[in-house]
């Protein structure tokens, strides 16, 4: 297996392989995801494959946290050993995660709340657009603005820590059940989104938590299986092991977490699965080596809920906070004990764990608390959270929580208008034949599909549902809607304004099985709008890439009788679109999960009040079988460690894979149409230093790693012109092709810059891109360093990964 050599050289893995996984084999199904692990797959056990990096580095306050660090150290100096154990161990309480108060020191505790698109356990809070939706804007300002607004709501409800944003999963597989919580199947775009979102959260005063670190790319077997007749630590089958080589982990999966560290993220959540054999929450190579040493991370590492599988090993491995604190599946049985808790005091007293390590754990927890001023006038926890918290209801509380804050306070402000605008800006126009869109006060429209109307399952999406529009996915990353504007509601309101006849049919089975001409009266409508949806949730991966609820058949039925069929998808991510070339399907719009203003956002696009400018954050293939790297869905052996996911595709995910193998696609990464047209011209480059070395200067590590990697080394500029007749926005995208001297396996091109610009008809604007050293570097597994290869780079700028009209060459490093 090719990847094993890189793992061995890097020190990420110390083992020899017999055989890895070949995703091209007969174990893969084309119509539903299925990858059955071959019997001769190399099995990595929990120990001996990922080298120890000990001790866990102490926080230094680097990056401007020195004053807060001093306050944290002073706080820790006043704690008893029992209080120190409390500070690193979660307790059931009013929030999803809770650190108890220490009244004698004036510390009111910490409240940690889900999630990446809303405060899940709260009333009178907004449901924002999902991560994949926000990424589809390709708008750095919107990403920041969304972060600020969400941070304001978390703080308003008394939550100290917002459990988001998400860079893991990155999107290795289109089947990933939680891809919608993250941003894009590209490390650069995800990195920018992470950085801007974190800055927004923390500028609003709430701690951000970057998750899930690292290699958490599938839901199937993400957790171990426990013996139902055994103890709460009696595991009969371990979680899957993500086996990733050194270069791949640096250039793909670690990349956006470097942006998070640079943004001074307060905390990082380690993931459920194993990494190269060892559980991610006790893997010292990953937590101590990559995160705390290489990236200079100054905050604290918290476990995913129930992701702690040891005490001393996890503490030494770099875990600082055990959430939610108990044993068993998802850590929900604190009454039975904890890997931390009293075991921390025992380990310190018997000399197994040095007290200095425990002190650093708490210093890391408290430093961002002081840095963000959460010790000064921070809002009290909203008591309604306790009433809504089904994860740890009051009956499970072991400690007392003094909830004196105002109940059910409304923190939404004017965020509804912001969510509406963000949803529209994220909407992607994939097809628009014969100027089907925008609609211009049509005389009649027909609305089809079970995604158009009101939900029938209530305000929280706990599981998939047949009837009702889909505006958020499921699991801990969902939200509780205080209201939801549906597409049908918004279309009827617009129809009333325009005196349009609006008819609707929401039963997909009826539509698919009927002659739709018998449904509408009296004549065919001017436009037929078909709303389709695709559910995804935490805890399970998608079974298909097609739309749900016979959506393809619904489109076929409508398009067979209506020559102006417009399809809108509300999806978690990638969909097969077999109807894309149907002559009667005149327009296709991808809206993803837009949040509570879903209907208003899509009507703004359909009627041209907002010109679509969203771009795909992934590739839509012609066929589902064209994708590589499906999740491992089954094993044929029964060993405790047998579940493995070998990332043999290495750097070839999404567009990198399609480019490397010259596979034609339906809609490429970065693609998206507009109601106007744009052109590019006059590409220019300018070096920012007289001499650029291959090896970066070795500077003292700061949050984000070696500061030299973040230094700009080249400027690239290009002129963008709106050549159409309406105002619109577009996203020039810069891709880099490395010289031939770069190591084998380097992708044909990689995104390294983008900017969204809005232009009036005929207006031109010069857009500049700053290329940092890291943008032109690869990770060298021998020297363990980022290197700029010698030779000529190709710089291309265009409007998608396969529409790159502007090209130039640069040679940063010569022999």
Curated annotation (Swiss-Prot):
Presence of keyword tRNA processing: no
InterPro entries reported in the protein's UniProt record: Cellulose_deg_GH3 (IPR050288), Fn3-like (IPR026891), Glyco_hydro_3_C (IPR002772), Glyco_hydro_3_C_sf (IPR036881), Glyco_hydro_3_N (IPR001764), Glyco_hydro_3_N_sf (IPR036962), Glycoside_hydrolase_SF (IPR017853), Ig-like_fold (IPR013783)
Cell compartments where the protein resides: Secreted
Source domain of life: Eukaryota
GO CC field: extracellular space
Primary localization class, coarse: secreted
Protein name listed in UniProt: Probable beta-glucosidase G
Species this protein is from: Aspergillus oryzae (strain ATCC 42149 / RIB 40) (Yellow koji mold)
Source organism phylogeny: Eukaryota, Fungi, Dikarya, Ascomycota, Pezizomycotina
């Amino acid at each position: 297996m090719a990847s094993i050599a890189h793992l061995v050289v890097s020190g990420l893995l110390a083992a020899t392989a017999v055989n890895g996984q070949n995703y091209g084999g007969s174990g893969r199904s084309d119509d539903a995801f299925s990858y059955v692990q071959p019997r001769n797959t190399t099995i990595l056990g929990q120990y001996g494959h990922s080298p120890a990096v000990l001790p866990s580095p102490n926080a230094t306050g680097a990056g401007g946290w020195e004053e807060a660090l001093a306050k944290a150290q002073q706080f820790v100096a006043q704690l008893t050993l029992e209080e120190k154990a409390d500070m690193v161990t979660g307790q059931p309480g009013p929030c999803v995660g809770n650190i108890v108060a220490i009244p004698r020191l004036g510390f009111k505790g910490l409240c940690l709340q889900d999630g990446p698109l809303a405060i899940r356990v709260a009333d009178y809070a907004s449901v924002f657009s999902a991560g994949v939706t926000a990424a589809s804007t390709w708008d750095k300002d919107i990403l920041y603005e969304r972060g600020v607004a969400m941070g304001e709501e978390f703080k308003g409800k008394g939550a100290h820590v917002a459990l988001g944003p998400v860079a893991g999963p990155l999107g290795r597989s289109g089947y990933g059940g939680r891809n919608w919580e993250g941003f894009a199947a590209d490390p650069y775009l995800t990195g920018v989104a992470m950085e801007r979102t974190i800055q927004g959260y923390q500028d609003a005063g709430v701690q951000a938590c970057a998750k899930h670190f690292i290699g958490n790319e599938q839901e199937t077997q993400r957790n171990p299986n426990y013996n139902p007749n055994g103890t709460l630590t009696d595991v009969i089958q371990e979680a899957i092991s993500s086996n990733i080589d050194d270069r791949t982990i640096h250039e793909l999966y670690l990349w956006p977490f470097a942006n998070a560290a640079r943004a001074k993220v307060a905390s990082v959540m380690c993931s459920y699965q194993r990494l190269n054999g060892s559980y991610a929450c006790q893997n010292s190579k990953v937590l101590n080596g990559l995160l705390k040493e290489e990236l200079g991370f100054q905050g604290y590492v918290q476990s995913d809920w129930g992701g702690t599988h040891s005490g001393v090993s996890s503490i030494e491995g770099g875990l600082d906070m055990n959430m939610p604190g108990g044993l068993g599946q998802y850590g929900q049985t604190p009454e039975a004990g904890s890997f931390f808790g009293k075991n921390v005091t025992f380990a310190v007293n018997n000399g197994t764990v040095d007290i200095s390590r425990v002190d650093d754990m708490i210093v890391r927890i408290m430093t961002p608390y002081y840095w963000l001023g959460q010790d000064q006038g921070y809002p009290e926890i909203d008591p309604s959270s306790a009433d809504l918290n089904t994860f740890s209801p009051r009956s499970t509380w072991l400690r007392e929580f003094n909830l004196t804050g105002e109940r059910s306070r409304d923190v939404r402000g004017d965020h509804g208008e912001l969510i509406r605008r963000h949803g529209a800006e994220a909407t992607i126009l994939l097809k628009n034949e014969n100027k089907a869109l925008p609609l211009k006060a049509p005389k009649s429209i027909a609305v089809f599909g079970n995604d158009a109307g009101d939900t029938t399952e209530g305000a929280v999406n706990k599981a998939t549902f047949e009837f009702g529009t889909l505006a958020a996915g499921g699991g801990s990353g969902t939200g509780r809607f205080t209201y939801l504007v549906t597409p049908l509601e918004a279309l009827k309101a617009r129809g009333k304004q325009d005196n349009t006849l609006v008819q609707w049919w929401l039963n997909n089975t009826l539509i698919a099985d009927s002659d739709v001409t018998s449904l509408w009266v009296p004549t065919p409508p001017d436009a037929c709008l078909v709303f389709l949806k695709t559910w995804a949730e935490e805890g399970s991966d998608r079974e298909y890439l097609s739309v749900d609820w016979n959506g393809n058949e619904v489109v076929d039925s409508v398009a067979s009788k209506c020559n102006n069929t417009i399809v809108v998808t509300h999806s978690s991510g990638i969909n097969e679109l077999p109807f894309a070339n149907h002559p009667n399907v005149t327009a296709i719009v991808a809206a993803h999960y837009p949040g509570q203003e879903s209907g208003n956002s899509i009507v703004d696009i359909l009627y041209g009040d907002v010109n679509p400018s969203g771009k795909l954050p992934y590739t839509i293939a012609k066929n589902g079988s064209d994708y590589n790297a499906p999740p491992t869905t089954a094993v044929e052996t029964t060993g405790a460690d047998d579940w493995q996911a070998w990332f043999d595709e290495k750097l070839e995910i999404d567009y990198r894979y399609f480019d490397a193998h010259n596979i034609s696609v339906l809609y490429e990464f970065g693609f998206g149409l507009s109601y106007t047209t744009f052109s590019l011209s006059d590409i220019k480059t300018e070096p920012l230093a007289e001499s650029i070395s291959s090896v970066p200067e070795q500077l003292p590590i700061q949050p984000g790693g070696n500061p030299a990697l973040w230094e700009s080394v080249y400027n690239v500029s290009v002129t963008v012109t709106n050549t159409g007749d309406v105002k619109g926005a577009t996203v020039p995208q810069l891709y880099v092709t490395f010289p031939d001297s770069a190591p084998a396996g380097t992708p044909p091109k990689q995104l390294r810059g983008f900017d969204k610009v809005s232009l009036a008809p005929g207006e031109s604007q010069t857009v500049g891109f700053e290329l940092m050293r890291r943008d032109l570097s690869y990770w060298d597994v021998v020297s363990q360093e980022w290197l700029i290869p010698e030779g000529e780079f190709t710089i291309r700028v265009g409007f998608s990964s396969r529409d790159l009209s502007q090209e130039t060459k640069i040679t940063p490093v010569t022999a």
